[in-house]
Each structure stands twice: as structure tokens, then as C-alpha cells.
């Protein structure tokens, strides 16, 4: 199947053969496993001090005193050590030694990447994620390698407008909301929707040029992963490939 290659002006300048990776079977189950594996690999173990609430000589008086048989401090009636006592240990706390990482086989992870790449060419999946693609000329969108050389935000804004993906960036900007819950107190005050993903063969400045656009991610094709292609385990992210990047896909993820 032939696809068009677009210039920075949004005009078709060439054609190329669509890589075989875009014929991969759609496997949302494998994609979800790969994304969860990447997310859980970043989980930092947490839990209380093993001796918290236990640094006391409190002992139970035993039966026959007419009071509950909980451990009590010496020469007093105050309870200690037990979970229901003030300053006592925690009942069933999180364990630092627990392994949260959901591992995945190497071949399974590569299958997930291939399937997620193929999903970027399906209009129904891209629209189901909420992306605005009314003005996008084709999926997958392939652009000349000059895109990777742009270093200024104003220049990338103009290029994105001509390529038809600016509508999706506006959606991400307008969708920025204050996060619900305590995360807003922990350096994660805002939640921004995911916008377009830019996949380049070689980064010659596009990261600097695109980093101020809300929701936009830039990645070299060698570092492509399932989490970038399917944020939140939902495949079908609006993706822009440079010509050199799309030519390397079959070789890297066969």
C-alpha cells in the first residue's frame, strides 16, 4: 500500500510503501499488558518502619483484672503496641519488600509495540481516543525529515497548523484541569490530555520546538514504547512519523 509523504507546508511531495508493521493484528490485551508493565516498573516500594509502634515495653496484665487484655505500659493503664492504641503499630501496612512490577516477555512487548503502531493508522481507534483529526490529510501521517530540525515553538505551531494537527493540540490545551484528589498537593496539580506523538529518526531540535505545546510528546523511533503509543492502555494515539523514522520501523520491531 502506498502512502503520501508531506512537506512542512502540508503538501504531498512524494509517495512511499507502507511498512509491513502496519498490517499487524490489533491486540488490545497485549498492549494493555505492556503499558501496565512499564507503569509498574516505575513504582517505588513504600511502607512504614518495621519497628514503628513497637518501641515499648508494654505487656498485657492478663485475665482477672476486669480490663481488656491489651498490652499496657508499666505502672499505668495506657494501652500501647496494638493497632487500636494511640501510637501503636499499623495493622496490615504496605510492605516495602512487595514486588509491584508486572513483568512481560520480550517478544510479547515487541508484539505490543507493533500492534500499537498499527493502531495509529486506524481512524476509528484514533477518533475513539478523542483526537481531533478532521483536518489531518491521512493516517499514518508521514512528514519530511525537515520536521526534526525545527527548534522554535512559533515555527512548530505554524507547521502543525498546516499539517492539520493543531486542532488536537488546542483540545489538549483546553482540556487542562486541576487534578482531583491529593495529587494536587504532591506536585501534580494539573492533568493535561494527551495530544499528538511526534516520532523522528533523529532529533535535531524538534524536542525544544515542540515541548511548549500541551500534550505533545517527541520520541526517537529507537525509544518507541507501548505507553507512548497507547497512553492509559488505550491504543490509537494521533502520531506523526518523519520519513526516516517510518523506514526504520520494520527493522527495529520485526
UniProtKB/Swiss-Prot annotation:
It holds the Pfam family Ribosomal_L4. InterPro entries: Ribosomal_uL4, Ribosomal_uL4_dom_sf, Ribosomal_uL4_euk/arc_CS, Ribosomal_uL4_euk/arch, Ribosomall_uL4-arc. Belongs to the universal ribosomal protein uL4 family. GO terms for biological process: translation. GO terms for molecular function: rRNA binding; structural constituent of ribosome. Keywords: Ribonucleoprotein, Ribosomal protein, RNA-binding, rRNA-binding. The keyword RNA-binding applies. Coiled coil: none annotated. This is Large ribosomal subunit protein uL4. It comes from the Archaea. SUPFAM superfamilies: Ribosomal protein L4. One of the primary rRNA binding proteins, this protein initially binds near the 5'-end of the 23S rRNA. It is important during the early stages of 50S assembly. It makes multiple contacts with different domains of the 23S rRNA in the assembled 50S subunit and ribosome. Forms part of the polypeptide exit tunnel. GO terms for cellular component: ribonucleoprotein complex; ribosome. The keyword Ribosomal protein applies. Part of the 50S ribosomal subunit.
Amino acid at each position: 500500500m502506498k502512502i503520501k509523504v508531506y512537506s512542512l507546508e502540508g503538501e504531498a511531495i512524494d509517495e512511499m510503501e507502507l511498512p509491513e508493521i502496519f498490517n499487524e493484528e490489533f491486540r488490545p490485551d497485549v498492549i494493555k499488558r505492556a503499558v501496565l508493565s512499564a507503569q509498574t516498573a516505575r513504582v517505588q516500594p513504600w511502607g512504614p518502619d518495621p519497628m514503628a509502634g513497637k518501641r515499648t515495653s508494654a505487656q498485657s496484665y492478663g485475665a482477672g483484672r476486669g480490663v481488656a487484655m491489651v498490652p499496657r505500659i508499666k505502672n499505668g493503664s495506657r494501652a500501647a503496641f496494638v493497632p487500636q492504641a494511640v501510637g501503636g503499630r499499623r495493622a496490615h501496612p504496605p510492605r516495602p519488600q512487595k514486588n509491584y512490577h508486572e513483568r512481560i516477555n520480550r517478544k510479547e512487548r515487541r508484539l505490543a509495540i507493533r500492534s500499537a503502531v498499527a493502531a495509529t493508522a486506524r481512524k476509528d481507534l484514533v477518533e475513539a481516543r478523542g483526537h481531533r483529526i478532521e483536518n489531518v490529510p491521512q493516517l499514518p501521517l508521514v512528514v519530511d525529515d525537515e520536521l526534526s530540525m525545527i527548534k522554535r515553538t512559533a515555527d512548530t505551531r505554524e507547521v502543525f497548523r498546516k499539517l492539520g494537527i493543531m486542532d488536537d493540540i488546542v483540545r489538549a490545551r483546553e482540556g487542562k484541569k486541576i487534578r482531583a484528589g491529593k495529587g494536587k498537593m504532591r506536585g501534580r496539580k494539573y492533568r493535561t490530555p494527551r495530544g499528538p506523538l511526534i516520532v523522528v529518526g533523529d532529533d535535531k531540535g524538534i524536542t525544544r520546538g515542540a515541548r511548549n505545546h500541551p500534550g505533545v510528546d517527541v520520541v526517537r523511533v529507537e525509544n518507541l514504547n507501548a505507553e507512548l503509543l497507547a497512553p492509559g492502555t488505550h491504543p490509537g494515539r494521533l502520531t506523526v512519523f518523519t520519513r526516516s523514522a517510518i523506514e526504520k520501523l520494520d527493522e527495529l520491531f520485526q
